[in-house]
């Protein structure tokens, strides 16, 4: 008797479009819009840098032309930002190691040359626009029968522009302006500017004041050298009266105010340009009111592909934010995610495995650091999830992925009585018996008297604890930031999966989520407990309790996301706990956290 098949495989599903393939042209369009906004900013800056009748049409036209020239020299700044853009900050264990990393020659010279090109153009336009009003000409007007001379006021403003270039470079590298505090921004440009306008003005004002106060003192120390170099350089281009001694002191209150105004406008211009770059390039997944993956022939497959793109962090962040939008606002996509099971691995299983891997990666890093204290092993990429051991053998499989027992490099089948003597083997290799002279294994403590040795160690430790060497000491805050460099991505992933679980009661018709709720709660509880135990073990030895929130800022945000997920799922599914096949430990832990939350609220 032949049995007929009652189920047939579905038709061949077309391969989903890569998420980055859809995102790349969108990023190019956003970069062009950011360049247009930068052009408008350069025109406004050139208008404020010029001096003349503000109502004149010729003055406006000249400002527009200068704005195009400023944009030509400001464009390398955008190119530098795009080449160095990142979604997470690289954090070292100590400030000294952080400075060595941030101010490496490759990074420093690239950023310095970029600012030198852009800032020099803006400062020269300001000096040229106010040359007649405050006597900032390069060459001073000579008297009758005298050669022209170099104008020291011009030399001072040029030196001030170089100080401004150095200040902007140091600020950009030290504060890591290439990676924003929030990796992805989903607000309009004008709203974002208005939200940060007060901070922009205050920050630019403080930086301008610091430059204006520092420059006169440094110029007074280096005045003779700067004057000789400027006079020698000018004499190569123009015929001037060359003198090695500078004239009278050029600085006045009016020149100081002009230098402050120039620095303030330049700093404000670069801060707004940075916000322009962020608000366009780090924008969210909404394109004309439509999500990015909706343009694909397989929206769910494209979304999962974007969330699994590890080599392109910006693509991963935007795809994760799109999942958050779907979980909060799009019931139709939620239904399609729950019903998309016609695959080798369903979409829900893909989303769950992504969240599980990120939770286990964090928990594994914390366990390694807590047990061994090896920070490099905890933060390395190999300290994440271990490979699965239940890999079936096949002739074409990679043998390196199969866990094997390493064997010693000798014949293990020879009986012990037939083995060779280690002493005879050494005689064969060395040709003589090994020396029986005892080796001094005590080290330097046996050569130097113990009292002197203790004094030296005490002096070195006291000298190392001095405030001067504070930048080389490892701090708890930097360690925690390096363990979770992108807390935003972790929190959004956990919150998105939690929202999908909460809405599964309404939209999950096949029951694909109910089977994994116990596993989700187990992952959440285990990761949360590891975070809590790690924090408690460090708080005991923490000397300053006032900085605990700052030191554990990233880990606290991750713990809050996990805690809220446990509380929300427990509250929503408390009537079905007996049907979820929860382990007694996880069920007890969920109820404890839920009751603590209710009692505190």
UniProtKB/Swiss-Prot annotation:
Transmembrane parts of this sequence: 35-55, 59-79, 107-127, 154-174, 183-203, 257-277
Pfam annotation, one family: Ndc1_Nup
Cytoplasmic side: 1-34, 80-106, 175-182, 278-601
Perinuclear space side: 56-58, 128-153, 204-256
KW Transcription regulation (keyword) present: no
GO biological process, alphabetically ordered: mitotic spindle pole body duplication; mitotic spindle pole body insertion into the nuclear envelope; mitotic spindle pole body localization; mRNA transport; nuclear pore organization; protein transport; spindle pole body localization
InterPro entries hit by this protein: Nucleoporin_prot_Ndc1/Nup
Membrane topology per record: Multi-pass membrane protein
MF GO annotations: spindle pole body-nuclear membrane anchor activity
Keyword terms: Cytoplasm, Cytoskeleton, Membrane, mRNA transport, Nuclear pore complex, Nucleus, Protein transport, Translocation, Transmembrane, Transmembrane helix, Transport
Cellular component GO terms, alphabetical: cytoplasm; mitotic nuclear bridge midzone; mitotic nuclear bridge midzone membrane domain; mitotic spindle pole body; nuclear envelope; nuclear membrane; nuclear pore; nuclear pore transmembrane ring
Annotated localization: Nucleus, Nuclear pore complex; Nucleus membrane; Cytoplasm, Cytoskeleton, Microtubule organizing center, Spindle pole body
Family according to the record: Belongs to the NDC1 family.
PANTHER family recorded: NUCLEOPORIN NDC1 (PTHR13269:SF6)
Function: Component of the nuclear pore complex (NPC) and the spindle pole body (SPB), which plays a key role in de novo assembly and insertion of both structures in the nuclear envelope. Involved in the formation of the bipolar mitotic spindle. Anchors the spindle pole body in the nuclear envelope.
Subunit structure of this chain's protein: Component of the nuclear pore complex (NPC). NPC constitutes the exclusive means of nucleocytoplasmic transport. NPCs allow the passive diffusion of ions and small molecules and the active, nuclear transport receptor-mediated bidirectional transport of macromolecules such as proteins, RNAs, ribonucleoparticles (RNPs), and ribosomal subunits across the nuclear envelope. Due to its 8-fold rotational symmetry, all subunits are present with 8 copies or multiples thereof.
Protein name (database record): Nuclear envelope protein ndc1
UniProt organism field: Schizosaccharomyces pombe (strain 972 / ATCC 24843) (Fission yeast)
